[in-house]
């Protein structure tokens, strides 16, 4: 692994830790972190009330860069991974699903975007 890749990995881990702390402080219960599935990895899985939330964390120099870094293909991959993760957990099947985004930018509080995308809704862009 190159030095640049190691640094990016370390920034990503730090951003995920910060996002976890932020979400727990807001009342979310963390269920999984860096959840690996056959379709790919989910940064965070949490529950709040009647919602099962799959959360992508993006750390970039600016909020615009963070928003631009998650495209339709990645949203589709996360949605597929979420279905795989949830399938064997029948105790969670009654919960509403939501796909959130946490943007981590240097010198700013994390920005939590609830319901950042809706699977299968091509008319609705990333909020």
UniProtKB/Swiss-Prot annotation:
Identify the Pfam families for this entry: UPF0102 (PF02021)
InterPro entries the UniProt entry points to:
Restrct_endonuc-II-like, tRNA_endonuc-like_dom_sf, UPF0102_YraN-like
From the UniProt record, which GO molecular function terms apply? nucleic acid binding
The family classification in the record reads: Belongs to the UPF0102 family.
Q: Which PANTHER family match?
A: UPF0102 PROTEIN YRAN
NCBIfam families reported for this sequence: PRK12497.1-5
Q: In its UniProt entry, what is this protein called?
A: UPF0102 protein Mmar10_3014
Supply the source organism for this entry: Maricaulis maris (strain MCS10) (Caulobacter maris)
Taxon lineage: Bacteria, Pseudomonadati, Pseudomonadota, Alphaproteobacteria, Maricaulales
């Amino acid at each position: 692994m190159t030095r640049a890749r190691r640094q990016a990995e370390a920034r990503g881990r730090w951003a995920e830790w910060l996002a976890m702390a932020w979400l727990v402080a807001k009342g979310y219960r963390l269920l999984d972190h860096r959840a690996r599935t056959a379709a790919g990895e989910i940064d965070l899985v949490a529950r709040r009330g009647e919602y099962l939330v799959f959360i992508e964390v993006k750390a970039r120099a600016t909020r615009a860069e963070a928003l631009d870094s998650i495209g339709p293909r990645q949203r589709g991959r996360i949605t597929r991974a979420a279905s795989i993760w949830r399938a064997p957990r029948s105790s969670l099947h009654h919960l509403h699903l939501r796909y959130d985004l946490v943007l981590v930018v240097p010198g700013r509080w994390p920005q939590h975007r609830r319901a950042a995308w809706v699977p299968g809704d091509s008319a609705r862009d990333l909020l």
